[in-house]
């Protein structure tokens, strides 16, 4: 697929082959890849789909990957030198001529209704060629909190009854707390990244 995209986009105007802000990509890492990323500070990458929209990256494939995978959202700065823009689909979908052409040719476009006709520009997508993904490019780490019942038990100091659980639900909603899968960023993310790096280096003997 990547080869076909490259072939059909090679003659497009330059504005469809550049990005003007940072973009993001969610990856579900296996335990092996998590260790490789922590030990080597990078993972090999190739042609891949990115988005301008952090919210899209966070919600991709249902949000935080299931237990057993490590969810990571990488960020690429548009001024970084180590990537190439294959095609900026977001910019393409902002082009009225392209949108009109898609609409007029929709009967000849494979899976139009479930593909570009459905998503259109909702994913703010860019296709990049990236040699490596590094720990310094991690914008968010995915993880899971304890269950609601476990958290309520910690809060009340005992197994909560129905009335207490309702009160706990109220407190969670009032304070806008997410129970279950969540993304951590900033200083909290940095602490988790450093912990994973140190753990991976110990396990792989790369210290």
Per-segment meaning from a language model:
Residues 1-21, 43-44, 54-71, 77-207:
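Conserved NAD+-utilizing ADP-ribose enzyme module
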Residues 33-46:
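Short, polar loop/linker segments at the starts of domains and inter-domain junctions
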